[in-house]
Swiss-Prot record:
Similarity comment: family membership: Belongs to the Mediator complex subunit 6 family.
Single GO cellular component term: mediator complex
Annotated protein name in UniProt: Mediator of RNA polymerase II transcription subunit 6
Subunit architecture: Component of the Mediator complex.
Regions of compositional bias (Low complexity) in chain numbering: 274-287
Annotated Basic residues bias: 315-324
Annotated region described as Disordered, given as residue ranges: 172-217, 254-324
Keyword Transcription: yes
Length: 324
């Protein structure tokens, strides 16, 4: 019982079949309040407890506990805390002729309330709590504050989970700006016209054949991607081998990032020049000029600055001897 008292009253359920057996085997209008008095929801300082104790020790109060109408009638003459039946399923189901209009629901409603006497006016009654008796089980109805608080807590919890999920969705790109979903590329393939529908019903595919087709399609896709990667790698190596030593500039850049310098490539330029006497394939040959023949005129002195050859020296010696 101590553990039950520590728990919130709105979260517990109380029932006692043994007390029901002691009270005649079923609950009715005259014993429902006494059955409720055995539950942890009952307050021992209420007017119900004091009136029951007085009826046990005073014969003049005995008739107050025989019927519920007499018991509640006596409570109305007192002020303070009390428990009264707010809804009686037997009275609600019975008609004026004493017959039942429908089967009783066996759900009782009990109010915990305070009564204050006012001279010349009706009593001021304030309802503090509401309890339900379903069969032999007693429940406490939750308050409006508890219901609203639970609803708000559920909404706040859902919003918190939403914010955690949405925090990872925003994405910023210079092209699209702030987006909350990844951009979907539009397909450029034109939709193929659908075939003419058949008048007969299409047979449903078997599960095994569908699974086998899915597995075969996945394997063919993987094989195609592996072949494409291998082909791309081979082409890359071929381009590297063929054009790996060529540069876009005559003077390639050397150095580290941030401190590049232009290198001199004289050796490369000299090596690219073709040797003398060789012609590049595809070039037009140049026409060679006619060699000039030198003709010496007798009696004409050679030009200054020219060194006489051996034949000229012999002619001069012969002329000198003939003159002597």
């Amino acid at each position: 019982m101590a553990g039950t008292q520590d728990a919130p009253l709105e979260e517990i359920l109380w029932r006692s079949p043994s007390h029901v057996q002691m009270m005649g085997g079923f609950l009715h209008s005259n014993n429902i309040l006494f059955y409720f008095a055995e539950s942890p929801f009952f307050d021992a300082t209420s007017n119900n407890a004091s009136l029951a104790i007085q009826a046990n020790y005073n014969e003049t109060f005995r008739h107050f506990v025989e019927t519920r109408e007499a018991f509640e009638g006596r409570l109305k003459t007192m002020q303070g805390l009390e428990f009264v039946v707010s809804y009686d399923p037997l009275q609600a189901a019975a008609q004026s002729n004493g017959q039942f209009a429908h089967e009783p629901s066996n759900i009782w409603v009990i109010h915990k309330q305070t009564r204050r006497k006012r001279p010349g006016l009706e009593d001021e009654v304030e309802v503090l709590s509401t309890f339900f008796v379903v069969g032999d089980c007693i429940y406490m109805a939750p308050s409006v504050a508890s219901v609203v608080g639970n609803r708000i807590l559920s909404a706040v919890t859902s919003l918190t989970n939403l914010m955690k999920t949405a925090a990872s969705l925003p994405n910023f790109t210079p092209a699209h700006g702030h987006t909350y979903m990844p951009p979907v590329s539009k397909s450029t393939d034109t939709a193929q016209p659908s075939a003419q529908p058949s008048k007969e019903n299409t047979p449903m595919p078997d599960a095994d054949s569908t699974k086998a087709s899915l597995v075969g399609g996945a394997q063919s896709t993987n094989a195609g991607s592996v072949f494409q990667h291998t082909r791309t790698l081979a082409e890359s190596f071929s381009l590297l081998t063929q054009y790996g030593d060529e540069f876009m500039d005559e003077n390639p850049l050397v150095g580290e990032p941030g401190s590049f310098i232009m290198s001199r490539n004289n050796e490369g330029a000299a090596s690219k020049q073709p040797p003398v006497g060789t012609t590049r394939p595809g070039t037009v040959p140049v026409r060679a000029g006619t060699p000039q023949v030198k003709v010496d005129t007798p009696g004409k002195t050679p030009d200054k600055g020219l060194t006489p050859g051996p034949d000229e020296n012999k002619l001069r010696k012969k002329k000198g001897k003939s003159g002597v």
